[in-house]
Amino acid sequence: MKVNKKFLRNIFFLFFILLVSSCIQKDSDSNQDSSPAYKNPDLDVEQRVDDLLSRMTIEEKIGQMVQFVGMNHLKRSEKFLSIEELKKSDASGFYPNLHSSQIPDAIKSGSVGSFLHVLDVAEANFLQKHAENSRLGIPLIIGIDAIHGNAMVRGTTVYPAPLAMASSWNTELVEQASIETASEMRATGSHWTFAPNIDLARDARWGRVGETFGEDTHLVGEMGVAMVRGLQQGDFSSRNAV
């Protein structure tokens, strides 16, 4: 039987083209997985969010709504926990059936998305490192009560309480203090403060009157806006904004 060499050559060439195309497609798929859209800072926010949500499991979405106190709080409670507190499960920084040693695994599994009152940068970096090693690498949100300065963290600047700030009627001073507060928060690993408190202080029996700007609606509004301007610094593009 005589073999048509031209026919065989064409078959071989076609096979070679298909093989190369397959390799290119596999390489393209691999690149897409290693650099997903939600990690691309050049894309718009909505596109990145949509891509991330499409990849998240329901457990990971729930995890983003879970917040624990910082590990140092947990360790302190574990060390000094009384029998009475253990019975009532009401100790500060205590969670039944959760030990501080389990926190890294909770982060890596996507079971927690936020921490409260992380009081030093070493702890913040420790927690974020475990978040980097999670399946999707979603950073943790770290919040703190920076009501009048980042005062819960040792060595930071403490400003007068908001009620005293309001007595100055100086919104520029309040804004500048808030800028400095945001800077010190970011330097210690926090991104979120539970301030300002813009409730109206109408009942002196309330325990958080000192965290407000008083009872006057106009003054509270002006001071609240000034504090927000200082903390957010516009569009959050500043590395020191919170």
Placement of each model-derived feature along the sequence:
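Bacterial N-terminal signal peptides that target proteins for export
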Residues: 2-12
